Amino acid sequence: MSQINISIDCVLFGYDSDLDLKVLLIKRKYDPNTAAYKDHNSLPGDLIKYDEELSPAASRILESLTGISDIYLKQFSIFSDPNRVKHPKDQKWLRKFRALPEERVITVGYIALVNIEDFNTDATYFKDEIIGELTREGYYEKIWAKVNDIPELAFDHNNIVEEALKYLKKELNHELSSILLPKNFTLPQLQKLYEDILGKKIDKRNFRKQILKEGSIVKTKHTTNTGKKGKPATFYQFNDTIKETVKD
């Protein structure tokens, strides 16, 4: 009987100053003789160790492949299709570094949230001395892809991203929004984040009326010149109650 492996794949959502919700992907080295995907984009993921529990393994894997740690990280689903790594493209790539590439792999999906501006987005985390033995798998760069423009990914990772976005949509609240947004943000930034997650346009007037009525955000003294005629844009912050909820 073949062995069943357990892996963890992390869907790291980030929001940036371009007002785009994005997903962090790992771009692996391309060997034209053996690689199946030109650029081979995938989610940050790896097999768990024999003596690891899931949550510590998720933190280890995310940090080892992205350099990012101590962030919101939560299990959201399990992907157990017996054929999820059996596609010829995937098998061709797996043979590069696994003795038994045909073995079944059940993956546990974790969702992670960051504000992109808070983290270094260059590829320095992927130098050989940082990755160590993981360089055998060819990791060498990380990229942020817009959620509405995800390229073809390895294995069933496109489906995992879709399920993670559904989970985020279902769980969307101001606590999660406060993680993705900068400390000081404008109402257009907040509205665009909600639109990206919900996948639809929101009426500007109704959105602002509802948000301000809830009292979850407070106006700051900061303003910015948008370069357009009219009043400068006002910055807001989530109130202390929201911030404490996130910490808990």
Annotate the PLM regions.
Residues 33, 128-144:
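Short, cationic low-complexity segments
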Residues 1-41:
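N-terminal strand-loop-strand
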Residues 193-201:
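Short helix-coil junctions and helix-kink-helix linkers
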Residues 201-219:
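Charge-enriched amphipathic alpha-helical scaffolds
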Residues 42-51, 179-180:
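Short histidine-centered catalytic/ligand-binding loop motif
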Residues 4-6, 22, 56-59, 63-125, ...:
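Active-site segment of metal-dependent pyrophosphate-handling enzymes
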